[in-house]
Amino acid sequence: MSRIGKKPIPVPRGVEVTITEENRVTVKGPKGTLSQQFSPEMLITHENGVITVARPSDDKRHRALHGLTRSLIANMVTGVTEGYQRILEITGIGYRAAREGKNLVLQVGFSHPIRVTPPEGITFEVLERRSANEPQQVIIRGIDKQKVGEEAAKLRALRPPEPYKGYGIKYRDERIRRKAGKAGKAR
C-alpha cells in the first residue's frame, strides 16, 4: 500500500467536501472553493470528517494514482483553509516592482516595464524595501497550490538570477550558485 495514499485526510471544521459519482471532488472552505476531477478508478470516500483514498488493485498505474490523488485532495483542503503563498525576491540596480490595481508592474532591466495580470484566484503583494541594499519582495497568494507555483515560476522566468552578481528574480529560499568573475590582467 502507498505510504502517502493510505494516510487519511482530516477535514477541519468549516470545510465542506462533496464527492460525485464520477469522482469530482469539490472542497468549500473559508477562503474559497476548489473543484477537481480525479480518475474514476480511485475509490474516494468521505466519512466522519475524514477523506480516504483507496485503489482497486496493486498494478503500477494504480499505485502511482493512489498517492497522487491523496496529495492533491490534501492540497485542496489546505488551500481553502490556510491558502498558499510563494515569496520572490527582486535583486538588482534599478530593478523594482509595484502594484497598479491588481496588476504587477516589474522593471527588471528591460527597456520597458512588464505588466503582469494575475489569473483568477491569485493576488500579488509588493513589500517595500527596508534598506537600499535589501532585495524587494513580491508575495504571490492563492488557494490553488498549482496556480501559485506556476505564477511564481512565470515571474521568475522573466529575469532568472544571473550567477555573477545574483541580479534577477529568485525564490526567497533559493540558493544561487555563484561564479567568480574573470581574473584581472597580470602586469
Swiss-Prot record:
- Which Gene Ontology cellular component annotation is one that this UniProt entry carries? cytosolic large ribosomal subunit
Q: Which UniProt keywords apply?
A: Ribonucleoprotein, Ribosomal protein, RNA-binding, rRNA-binding
Q: Extract the signal peptide range.
A: none
Molecular function (GO) terms for this protein are:
rRNA binding; structural constituent of ribosome
Any one Gene Ontology biological process term? Answer: cytoplasmic translation
Gene3D superfamilies (alphabetical): Ribosomal protein L6, alpha-beta domain
Q: Which SUPFAM superfamilies match?
A: Ribosomal protein L6
Annotated InterPro entries: Ribosomal_uL6-like, Ribosomal_uL6-like_a/b-dom_sf, Ribosomal_uL6_a/b-dom, Ribosomal_uL6_bac-type
Keyword RNA-binding among record annotations: yes
State if Ribonucleoprotein is listed as a keyword: yes
The record describes its quaternary structure and partners as: Part of the 50S ribosomal subunit.
Q: Which family does it belong to?
A: Belongs to the universal ribosomal protein uL6 family.
Q: What does this protein do?
A: This protein binds to the 23S rRNA, and is important in its secondary structure. It is located near the subunit interface in the base of the L7/L12 stalk, and near the tRNA binding site of the peptidyltransferase center.
- Name-wise, this protein is Large ribosomal subunit protein uL6
Q: Which organism is it from?
A: Roseiflexus sp. (strain RS-1)
What is this protein's gene name?
rplF
